[in-house]
Amino acid sequence: MNSPSPMLPPASLDDDALAHALASGAAEVLLALRAEVDAAGGSFVAKEVKDAGDAAAQAWLAAALAAARPDDAVLSEEAKDDASRTRADRVWIIDPLDGTREFAERPDAEAPAGQWRDDFAVHVALWQRGAGLTAGAVALPARGQVLTTADGLVPGDDSAAVLAGDRPLRIAASRSRPPEFVAALAERPDVELVPMGSAGVKVLAVADGTVDAYVHGGGQYEWDSAAPVAVARSRGLVCTRLDGSELEYNRENPWLPDLFVCPPALAPRLRELLDTVGVASVVGVDSKEGAQP
């Protein structure tokens, strides 16, 4: 697939602006690839589109980071892990295409060429030694959105309505295979599951108020959550492990089993609900089997 690549961002950008430019550029690459599929008649093999998207976005991001921040280390889902990053002071943690399944799917079997699922994302985050996640951006290419750590706090959430019992607690969940404890929560009348695609889409759905929380225990990697967590924290959300412990990034093993994201006012209530379904049994699970973002 031969669409022209976006221009590489200049090295003069600060880290927040660079994260935005990187996520935006990779988003352009992915949308151009979809446009090529449609221009060729609209029929495609999903695996080929997934692989092409992963490869094209990774190649552009790698070139852009090498040009703009040549001395920084990189941890990417789509590149071989270089163990020397654990000794670096600055590490970019990226997922060039979060939600490959959604990227290569139409909304339904009858959808014509030009119509695609929109719940996939591009993740770009910067980790710095002694400071943790310091910059990040998440692009939702098909929705034309890029959210960054430079956006700042947003207006208050609707937590009061949940706490008062006026409406159920809305929890973002995997549309294909939610963790068992999340499915158990859905049996409660005061909880509503909202199925959606990639991990980035789920976390940002909490940030923009579409849902109240995202809790995950099926296993992820650092690139699945680093950028969404950076953006969510910049908007005042609680982002921790399920047991309340800190999320740690740029570890030797990038496996990060679980995630808890919600507004501060809802955190105590959500933790109480998780206790009722035995969530402690999944915290810290170290198996990579069955991971679903």
Please provide the spans of the model-predicted regions:
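N-terminal subdomain of lithium-sensitive/metallo-dependent phosphomonoesterases centered on the IMPase/IPPase/PAP
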Residues: 1-97, 107, 184, 281, ...
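Residue-level signal for inorganic ion chemistry
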Residues: 30-33, 54, 65, 100, ...
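Solvent-exposed beta-strand sheet faces enriched in polar/charged residues
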Residues: 75-77, 125, 250
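DPxDG-like acidic metal-binding loop motif
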Residues: 85-152
